[in-house]
Amino acid sequence: MSSNNESIKNWVSDKIFDILGYRESTMVDYIIALSKKAKDVNSFISTLTEQDFPINSNTKSFAQELLNKSQQKIQNITSSSSSSSSTSLSSSSSSKDKEKEKIEFLKKNKSYKLVIDHDDDIVNSSGSSDSDSDSERKRKKKEKKKEKKDKKDKKDKKSSTRKKSDNNWDDEIEPEPIKPNEKEDENNNNENNDNNNDNNNLQKRQPYKSIIEEENNNDNNNNNGEEDEYEREQREVKELSDRIKKRDEKSTKKKIVDDSETKESIERKNRLEQNEQLETERTKSRRKYLVGEEQKRLILLKREIEEEYELFKDQKLTEQEIKDFEKKKKLYELASQRINESQQSDDYYQLPSEIKDKDSLLKSSYINDNKNKKGNDSSSSSSYNPEQKEWEQNRMKSAISENRGLSTANIGGGNEEYEYVFEDQIEFIKEEVLKQGQKGDGVMILKPGDDGSAQAKMTIQEVRKSLPVYPYREQLIDAVREYQVLIIVGETGSGKTTQIPQYLHEAGFSKTGKIGCTQPRRVAAMSVAARVAEEVGCKLGNEVGYSIRFEDCTSQKTVLQYMTDGMLVREFLTAPDLASYSVLIIDEAHERTLHTDILFGLLKDITRFRPDLKLLISSATMDAERFSDYFDGAPTFNIPGRKYEVTTHYTQAPEADYLDAAVVTVLQIHITEPLGDILVFLTGQEEVDQAAEMLQTRTRGLGTKIKELIITRIYSTLPTDLQAKIFEPTPPNARKVVLATNIAETSLTIDGIIYVIDPGFCKQKMFNPRTGMESLVITPVSRASANQRKGRAGRVAPGKCFRLFTAWAFDNELEENTIPEIQRTNLGNVVLLLKSMGINDLMNFDFMDPPPAQTLIAALEQLYALGALNDRGQLTKLGRKMAEFPVDPQLSKMIIASEKYKCSEEILTICAMLSVGNTIFYRPKDKAFAADAARKLFFHPQGDHLTLMNVFNQWRESGYAVQWCFENFIQHRSMKRAQDVRDQLELLLERVEIPLVSNVDDTDSIRKCIASGFFYNSAKLEKSGLFRTTKHNQSVQIHPSSCLFQSPPKWVVYHELVLTTKEFMRQIVEIQSSWLHEIAPHIYKEKDVNDNQKLPKNIGKKQINK
């Protein structure tokens, strides 16, 4: 039987390899099991196609042959058993009457049950029936005597037949009831012996019963052991969760501490506030007094000098009296000069375009000294630096002289100003004006020095009333009271995020619980909370607060709480019913982030058993029908669009280089268009930095030919102080350009934006579950996203949107909506998070857009291989620890394994550097050779992970110096980001009870620890010079930026696969093949990683160089 099963497995394995191109033992067993359950060939073929088998003749023939083999095997088994039973029946009786009698007798024997406790009753009842009918018993005894001889002769045959059978329990116990009856006929024929024999029968059957009970007890003990182990594991997971929760409460940074619990704290707080206020008032009063006192003292000094001069002008004074008089006079002159300089405006060189006339250009603003009676030039006598003043005046005279070819009349008129013209200007086609919102707004031209809106001069309440959502306040509140779930649709900037929570708070919804509002990004949550706190008139953290990871700016007074969607998801771990909230607003729902889609499913269940909870889904797009259908036909509340019209301009032909086209368009707008800030959408940090460098290079040599252009940037990893620069008001006679990723598409609102440049691309994360390849791919945006970008221009004035693609491409090549993130990303983190929340049936979880089943299965398989899930699909203690780290499951497994290999310090450094990505080194074009040489100094012969560790350790030894980064061509901003990530991971390491240990010299332990998390991502070098992955059997190559590119090792593990021109492994480290079996014996067998074959020397390098 075993040899037959083995041959079938080998045959199925060969066929699968011929059809699919790879083989796997678990797959073979699975296909064989499917064949046994299949009803016919067609159903079996359809099942195979669901497992990604191609529909062709090979698959159909394979299915037919496998079904034939399975059915033939079953028929052989049944035929063997039936033949043995027929042989025993034919030999046991020669007549049909005897056969019928035996069948009846066997049926009677089967009524004796060996396991049940009431067997004694059955035997006794049978004995009593015999005593009631003597004749019947005697007749049966005579019949049994006749069968006595035949049964003795056939006794051996029956026993041999029973040995050949398939260990059927009925076959083993069939002859036992006959033996005591035979003994009864030979020894005794009276009734008493019948009862005794019945008792003997029970005594002889008792061993079978005890054996069964013993086996059942053993099974129960084994089951109880498994249950105990499972319960123990679940108890450990729960205890770990409780400990983590307690540590969270202690370690979470509380920016606002609520001291209102005791009277003493209230009194102390009031005293401190009174003291601070008193000190502030004292300072103001002192300053005001000093200003007035200064004037009085100066007047008194002047009078004193005049009086002394009148009294002593005709008298001869001593030398000391003359010195005192000169000292007072000098003191008065200095004090007067300082006051005059503080009151006058600085005299500085102005651009010719701003000069009104020649007289104003040459006009001096210096104040003459009244004490100077000698008729000297005022500017020369009162100037603090007369040489600089003279030089500036000479320069201004030469700038307007007629010898330079400019007349003073032209300068003052401003009608004939010259424009700087670029050679590579882009021609745009203007689309029809799309009027959305208010009509009749005339075209507004921004004047020099205007900030783009009148909101700067308006009070906060006036600004609130000017927003589009304000006229619909009462209708919105009535709709929230009437419906439990409400879909709100309004364009970005209409006031949904800042005003709706305040309206609900003012209407009394916060009396029964907090009003929560989620944001997809932490930057948005912090900035919006600060704005709302300013509008409410409270300190941030009191009535209005925010909550992001590692930072909690809330208190017990907080009634309006802004948070990231990930924080609300994590609140389900501790409070599944969200009892502290009365209203929840899911903002920017149209972005369909990973956590937003999870919240949809969780909140949909909560609203069904919490009728008091109000749920508002806020979206900036018109795709509200899908949200309404998902939430059981929830009504939709529409808010009108933007206040000003936006014109759209398309290019006449497609642009080959959209980044260069965006830079040219910025300069073109800056030269030819009226004042107003520019917003440029780019795909990522690299493009933002590159565009900023290109703009600085092209404007550096223009000088006064163009007006001032302020270049700012915004992306998620940018430091907070640099992010805040985009919100600073633009100085007069200048223009600000904001280079942004899609973070500025909906999450941030920047005032003063008049022009939007949309290249039509964005960077999306894509995941292929078949190859396990996840990469960021630059893809065209959707039409909904393009309209979102366009809407950023119509907030404060009529705007323009310049799209760097054709109108035909917008209508025919762009998708209608963006693919949800949950359908194009690795679900390892999602599955781990849902499992930690106790949601086990992931296949039937109510997603709005369910992820591909193959992606979900791949995530479950990966988590099981990593040890995060047990064989029941439940979360293990290791998995509960892994869920605490905001990184990929493979990285979190590597961090937890560092406790075993005693290298947690080094692993934290490596994880932090890997999280930064590929922005560590930079390579200027003019210093490429020096940059490459500096980078090679950090190379480690065993892999890129250790190279990154060297970079961080040397930077730390230099005292985190900026100059060290500059000298080694390393981006200091990326290193600071890695340092922040490492600090966060170190705090989490303490939460999951893992000590911090350093072992920098033991590189084998570090590489083993890396392999313990990334054993799935292993690859072996082949004779062709290419690598082949062991899991997916895919040909890949080492990325040219790797330190092992020139001398590839035989076995490596890689951090990620990147699909560019080829499939590249990025961030690799050398391992030994035996480690794979040692770390993951459930995945790699010893024969799979047996490495006896030797490769020719440098074969990999030769093939790669080809």
Swiss-Prot record:
Keyword presence, Transmembrane helix: no
Reactions performed catalytically: ATP + H2O = ADP + phosphate + H(+)
EC number: 3.6.4.13
Record protein name field: Putative pre-mRNA-splicing factor ATP-dependent RNA helicase DHX16
Keywords, sorted A to Z: ATP-binding, Helicase, Hydrolase, mRNA processing, mRNA splicing, Nucleotide-binding, Nucleus, Spliceosome
Gene Ontology biological process terms in this record: mRNA processing; RNA splicing
Species whose genome carries this gene: Dictyostelium discoideum
Function: Required for pre-mRNA splicing as component of the spliceosome. Contributes to pre-mRNA splicing after spliceosome formation and prior to the first transesterification reaction.
Compositionally biased residues, Basic residues: 138-155
Signal sequence residues: none
Residue stretches of biased makeup (Basic and acidic residues): 156-167, 232-283
Compositionally biased spans, kind Low complexity: 78-94, 189-201
Region (Disordered): 73-100, 120-286, 366-394
UniProt-listed CDD domains: DEXHc_DHX16, SF2_C_RHA
Gene3D superfamilies per record: 1.20.120.1080, P-loop containing nucleotide triphosphate hydrolases
A GO term, aspect molecular function: ATP binding
Positions of the Helicase C-terminal domain: 665-838
Motif (DEAH box): 587-590
